Amino acid sequence: MQKYDKMEKIGEGTYGTVFKGRNRDTMEIVALKRVRLDEDDEGVPSSALREICLLKELKHKNIVRLIDVLHSDKKLTLVFEHCDQDLKKYFDSLNGEIDMAVCRSFMLQLLRGLAFCHSHNVLHRDLKPQNLLINKNGELKLADFGLARAFGIPVKCYSAEVVTLWYRPPDVLFGAKLYTTSIDMWSAGCILAELADAGRPLFPGSDVLDQLMKIFRVLGTPNEDSWPGVSHLSDYVALPSFPAITSWSQLVPRLNSKGRDLLQKLLICRPNQRISAEAAMQHPYFTDSSSSGH
């Protein structure tokens, strides 16, 4: 840690405590993530270290840059570029109103970051407003990319705060283990709806069952016809057969018709039918300049 001075604590992350830090040579402000490792562990698993070191190669303006990996006696500190606030805090400052141009800009930046990582075969797996960071220039950056693969997604944050299910797709809630890029696209859809509603989450489930019910009340309950193989997923449970809603304009009233169309292409229960990040970036919601109206 000699290279960095530890300053004040910024918060608790999924994997450990986050501090503000300063590079002693360049005076650059950074974020220091101290990763908590299990006490009975043999220190840092080599597989995790390999994964983490690969992430240093991911350089894109919409990805929070991993600057350094400091590894010593069972301690692992990840040094990231520092951003001013996360999307959750940004929402809290809004008082329930968001400029639709800002909503669109943030969503496009989110998709650009996703497309870049997906093209390098890196998934996020735990996207949520808390790990979308925003700097003073209105640039949005994805944080904690690839960490889920290196460390696993814990059921509880080490600070005992429960890891949110609100952005998890139905396939993962049903126990699917083979993750593809589609997991992040579902989360992106949940975030688009939340952006358009100035920070009100679309599916705020209290547990796995409640989460699935909230989703199916909107999208309709899937079955073997609409989603072949769904009933064979390891944690599948038969749920009441809800019809899909007919009016998305009531669900996300602030979002214009093109935005709603994109949302419907992201929020599809069957994972292989969700739109990709690359395709979503080309959607008329972003390309049509008259898109601000309804």
Swiss-Prot record:
Belongs to the protein kinase superfamily. CMGC Ser/Thr protein kinase family. CDC2/CDKX subfamily. The keyword Transferase applies. The modification Phosphothreonine is found at residue 14. It catalyses: L-seryl-[protein] + ATP = O-phospho-L-seryl-[protein] + ADP + H(+); L-threonyl-[protein] + ATP = O-phospho-L-threonyl-[protein] + ADP + H(+). GO terms for cellular component: cytoplasm; nucleus; protein kinase 5 complex. Keywords: ATP-binding, Cell cycle, Cell division, Kinase, Nucleotide-binding, Phosphoprotein, Serine/threonine-protein kinase, Transferase. Residues 4-286 form the Protein kinase domain. The modification Phosphoserine is found at residue 159. One of its GO terms (biological process) is axonogenesis. One of its GO terms (molecular function) is cyclin-dependent protein serine/threonine kinase activity. Probably involved in the control of the cell cycle. Interacts with D1 and D3-type G1 cyclins. Possible regulator of neuronal differentiation and/or development. ATP binds at residues 10-18, 33. Abundantly expressed in all adult tissues. Lower levels found in larvae and early embryos. Barely detectable in late embryos. The active site is at 126 (proton acceptor). Disulfide bonds: none annotated. Its EC number is 2.7.11.22. The modification Phosphotyrosine is found at residue 15. PANTHER family: CELL DIVISION PROTEIN KINASE, CYCLIN-DEPENDENT KINASE 5. SMART domains: S_TKc. This is Cyclin-dependent kinase 5 homolog. The gene is Cdk5. It comes from the Eukaryota.
